[in-house]
C-alpha cells in the first residue's frame, strides 16, 4: 500500500484490489460502531465511490477502469458497503487487454497486458539520445537548443511508432503466447474496442512527453481508450513496464480523518 500526503491533512493511498474489501472493513471498524461495513454510508458517482463513516471519516475511492453502471447495477441505491467493495475489487481484476505506453525523453516502453492477474503478452522498449540543457550562451546555445529539440521530437516519434507497432501486432493476432502466457494457459485475443484488440490504454512517464507522443496520428485509433489515470514511473525500462499493473490496477483512495 502506497501513501502520499494530500492538501488539507488528507492522505492518498494506493490499495491493491485483492486487499480492498478488507481495507474497507478495517475502515469501518476504526470509524464505525457496528459490524464491519454496516455503519458506512456510500455514494456512487460516475468517477468514484465515497465511503463516509459515522465519525466523519471519508474514504473517496477511485477504482481503475470505473464503470459504476456496469459494476454496481444490481445492488440498489445505495449498495451495501461490503458488497460494493467486493464488486469493485472484482471489476479491477477482470480479464481485459490493457495497452501501456510509458515515455520519458530519451526512453520509452510499450506493451499489452492480458489476463487476471495481468501478464505482459507483447512489448518493446527503446531509447534515443536527447542531450541535456546547455549552460552556454549566444549562438552556441541556440544551435544546441535546436539540436536538442530535434532529438526530442525524433525520440517522441519513435515512442509513438513503437506503441503503434506493439498495439497493432496485438490487434492483428500476430502475438503468440510466450513462456509466461503458456504457463498461465492464456492466448492473445483480438476484438477489444473498435477493433483495436484493446479494452483500455494507460499512459505514464513524463506528462509533457506523453502528451506529444500520444498526439501522433498513428495512435489516433487508441485515443478514446485512454484512461484518466497517469502512471508516475522512472525511466521506462522493461522492469518498469512489467510493474505497471501494480499501478494501473490500484484503487486510489483519498482518506480524510476526522479532527482529533
Would you name each region that the model predicts?
Residues 1-260:
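Terminal alpha-helical anchor/extension segments at protein ends
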